[in-house]
C-alpha cells in the first residue's frame, strides 16, 4: 500500500473532492495526506475530517486578461514548490494527486520535478490555469465532463465529480443543525466562502415571499443560510426578527444537504454534484465572473434535466422569489428531486481512485 498526497486548496470545490477520494483510498488500505496552503481553508477541513495535513506557501497566478502577476505571489509560489519538494523527498509518496486551484500547484509541480507520478482531477469543461500548467507532465487526468477544452489528447478519463458519499437521516441532520422537523427546509449556500450577492439579496427576498411568520402557500418554511464566515455579522442583524431564518457562517455540508428540501446556490460543479447526490432541487444563481461563464452552462444543464431553475444574477431581485415559490410547491419539488437523483455522481470517487492506483510507482 502507498502514501498518496492530495494537492488541493482554496475553495470547497477543490477541497471536498480531495477529501472524498482520500476516504476511498484509505478504505483500500492506502495512506492519504492533504497538501495545501498553510493557514488556508484546506487546513481547517483536514482537521475536521481527521486527515493529515502538510502546509506550504502558495501564490495566486494571474489568469489571461488579469494583467501581470504580482511578484510577491510568484515568490510565494516558488517558496511553496521548494517546501513541497522537501516534504515529498522525505515522504516518498506513490503519487501526488492535483485537484486544481492555486494551492494545489506547489505540490503538483514539486512532484513533477522529482519524478513522482502525478494524476489530476479537472471538474470543469475547460482546463483551469493550474491544471494547464501541470497537465502536460501528468500521467492522467480524471474529468467530470466527457470533453474538456485544453486537455492534451490521450490524457482524459471520464470519472465524474467525486463527492462525499455520506447521508444522514433527515431527523438527525435537522437536530444537528438546530432546525425543526416539519417545516420545508430551504438551504441558502453561496459556496465555501459565501456569496456577497446572495447575502445582500436573499434575506430581503425571502422575507417578502414568506412574510414575518415564514409561510409558503403549502405550509411553514425554515431557512438555513450559510453566509460564509466573513459575512455573518452583516446578515445576522437583518434577519434577527425572523425566528424561522437561521444564518450561520459555516455549516456541516453533509448535514445541510441531508436536511434540505430545496436550495438556493451558485452553480459550481461541486455544489451541483452534492445536490444531485442528495436529491435536492436547486434554484441556481450562476457566478457571472466564472471562467468562460462555466457556471451558467452548468446551471442550464441542471435546468434542462429538470432538477432546478436558473436565475441570472442581474435578475436576482425580480425573479428569485417566483422561482423559489415555484420550486417549493410539493409536486414540482418531487419531480425535481427525482430528476436530481438521476444526475447523482455515485461512484466517482471510486472510479478516480482506480485511476490513481493505476499510476502509483
UniProtKB/Swiss-Prot annotation:
Main location, first listed in the record: membrane
Keyword flag Ion transport: no
GO MF, one example: undecaprenyldiphospho-muramoylpentapeptide beta-N-acetylglucosaminyltransferase activity
Disulfide partners: none
SUPFAM superfamilies according to UniProt: UDP-Glycosyltransferase/glycogen phosphorylase
Keywords: Cell cycle, Cell division, Cell membrane, Cell shape, Cell wall biogenesis/degradation, Glycosyltransferase, Membrane, Peptidoglycan synthesis, Transferase
Enzyme class: transferase
Reaction catalysed by this enzyme: di-trans,octa-cis-undecaprenyl diphospho-N-acetyl-alpha-D-muramoyl-L-alanyl-D-glutamyl-meso-2,6-diaminopimeloyl-D-alanyl-D-alanine + UDP-N-acetyl-alpha-D-glucosamine = di-trans,octa-cis-undecaprenyl diphospho-[N-acetyl-alpha-D-glucosaminyl-(1->4)]-N-acetyl-alpha-D-muramoyl-L-alanyl-D-glutamyl-meso-2,6-diaminopimeloyl-D-alanyl-D-alanine + UDP + H(+)
Gene3D superfamilies on file: Glycogen Phosphorylase B
GO biological process: carbohydrate metabolic process; cell division; cell wall organization; lipid glycosylation; peptidoglycan biosynthetic process; regulation of cell shape
Topology in the lipid bilayer: Peripheral membrane protein
EC numbers for this chain: 2.4.1.227
Pathway it works in: Cell wall biogenesis; peptidoglycan biosynthesis
Gene Ontology cellular-component annotations: plasma membrane
Job of this protein: Cell wall formation. Catalyzes the transfer of a GlcNAc subunit on undecaprenyl-pyrophosphoryl-MurNAc-pentapeptide (lipid intermediate I) to form undecaprenyl-pyrophosphoryl-MurNAc-(pentapeptide)GlcNAc (lipid intermediate II).
Family: Belongs to the glycosyltransferase 28 family. MurG subfamily.
Protein's UniProt name: UDP-N-acetylglucosamine--N-acetylmuramyl-(pentapeptide) pyrophosphoryl-undecaprenol N-acetylglucosamine transferase
